[in-house]
Amino acid sequence: DKQLDADVSPKPTIFLPSIAETKLQKAGTYLCLLEKFFPDIIKIHWQEKKSNTILGSQEGNTMKTNDTYMKFSWLTVPEESLDKEHRCIVRHENNKNGIDQEIIFPPIKTDVTTVDPKYNYSKDANDVITMDPKDNWSKDANDTLLLQLTNTSAYYTYLLLLLKSVVYFAIITCCLLRRTAFCCNGEKS
């Protein structure tokens, strides 16, 4: 049983949409993980920052962890809404001062400007070069795919060499056992 003086209000951890998700899916998923609360009765809903309209979201099951509980909720928004602030509103009996907890999710910039120093041929240190984020993201995705392909190739090469060594070991062992068996039948080598 929990002591009454222990803080058993929900402790939030937030996860923001990834760049890959926003580029590929044209949407973003905000995830709110609520942990270490007691009792297990909790209400969660989502709203845009300056709106009272409740947005459609999903929730996982409430799970028991040691003496407390945890639950997660997520909101998927279209690309047009990524530049707006969103709120995850949590109602729980042990919230501080009995007030609903409001967890703010910051807006996501969809047009990120990056500067790649190896392509910066400017002589003036104050010049800023902007690159198309789609090109930069594609380069990162290609690098990731190349790394994955290299690792997979190395794995299968290692596996093939290991298999070859096992077969070689089996053949040599058979040859040595036959030679030993032949030598032990009364003939000397």
From Swiss-Prot:
Q: Which SMART domains match?
A: IGc1 (SM00407)
The listed locations are: Cell membrane
| Protein name as annotated | T cell receptor gamma constant 2
Question: Which species does this protein come from?
Answer: Homo sapiens (Human)
The annotated subunit structure for this chain is: Gamma-delta TR is a heterodimer composed of a gamma and delta chain; disulfide-linked. The gamma-delta TR is associated with the transmembrane signaling CD3 coreceptor proteins following the stoichiometry: a single gamma-delta TR heterodimer associates with one CD3D-CD3E heterodimer, one CD3G-CD3E heterodimer and one CD247 homodimer forming a stable octameric structure. Upon activation, gamma-delta TR complex associates with FCER1G to initiate intracellular signaling.
Per UniProt, the keywords (alphabetical) are: Adaptive immunity, Cell membrane, Disulfide bond, Glycoprotein, Immunity, Immunoglobulin domain, Membrane, Receptor, T cell receptor, Transmembrane, Transmembrane helix
Q: Look up keyword Cell inner membrane and say if it applies.
A: no
Report the PROSITE patterns cross-referenced here.
IG_LIKE (PS50835)
Describe the location of the Ig-like domain by residue ranges: 10-104
Q: What does this protein do?
A: Constant region of T cell receptor (TR) gamma chain that participates in the antigen recognition. Gamma-delta TRs recognize a variety of self and foreign non-peptide antigens frequently expressed at the epithelial boundaries between the host and external environment, including endogenous lipids presented by MH-like protein CD1D and phosphoantigens presented by butyrophilin-like molecule BTN3A1. Upon antigen recognition induces rapid, innate-like immune responses involved in pathogen clearance and tissue repair.
Question: Among the entry's GO cellular component annotations, what is one?
Answer: external side of plasma membrane
The regions listed as transmembrane in this protein's record are 155-177
Give the record's glycosylation annotations as residue positions.
66, 120, 136, 142, 151
Gene Ontology biological-process annotations: adaptive immune response; immune response; T cell receptor signaling pathway
Pfam families, A to Z? C1-set
Principal place of residence: membrane
Recorded GO molecular functions are: transmembrane signaling receptor activity
| Cysteines engaged in disulfide bonds, as pairs | 32-88
